[in-house]
Regions:
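Conserved small/aromatic sequence motifs within transmembrane helices
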Residues: 1-149
Length: 149
């Protein structure tokens, strides 16, 4: 179900309008998600807060109000869901999380199809211990900033 997703602003105000002109430069091979390592819409300060996931901190409010959990598949944009296959939609069957298995396995360096596969595997085998393991692995993933853009 859709909900208001809180983040600190890391992009210029006209980022969504500029996205259309940048679609040709999408580095995501499958086109469902939009990723660019050197996205010109991201501010200098935005690069810093994204690298260390500081922009994600407001999502703790989403957890408190029950829209999200600490661990679970990352919430997609409605425009991304519109391009999902039935198989991709399986990742929408659980509450989204601030961190997830592919966040601790390479973050944005992981292609979308692999993200979906990892999310589905997580959904099938989730447990308190697995969530604790993912939370522990999140700390070094955030501190190194590897794969964050």
């Amino acid at each position: 179900r859709p909900f208001n997703f809180y983040k600190f602003r890391s992009m210029y105000i006209d980022a969504e309008q500029r996205r259309q002109e940048l679609l040709k430069a999408n580095e995501s091979k499958d086109g469902v998600i939009f990723k660019m390592q050197k996205d010109p819409r991201v501010t200098r300060f935005g690069r810093f807060i994204r690298k260390f996931s500081i922009d994600e901190l407001p999502q703790l409010f989403n957890v408190v109000v029950g829209d999200m959990s600490l661990v679970g598949p990352r919430p997609p944009l409605p425009s991304e869901v519109a391009e999902y296959t039935l198989e991709d939609r399986k990742r929408l069957t659980v509450k989204p999380g601030i961190t997830c298995i592919w966040q601790v396995s390479g973050r944005s360096d992981i292609p979308f199809r692999q993200q979906v596969a990892l999310d589905k595997e997580y959904i099938m085998s989730r447990s308190l211990w697995r969530d604790l393991w993912i939370l522990l692995k999140t700390v070094p993933a955030v501190l190194t900033g590897k794969g964050a853009y």
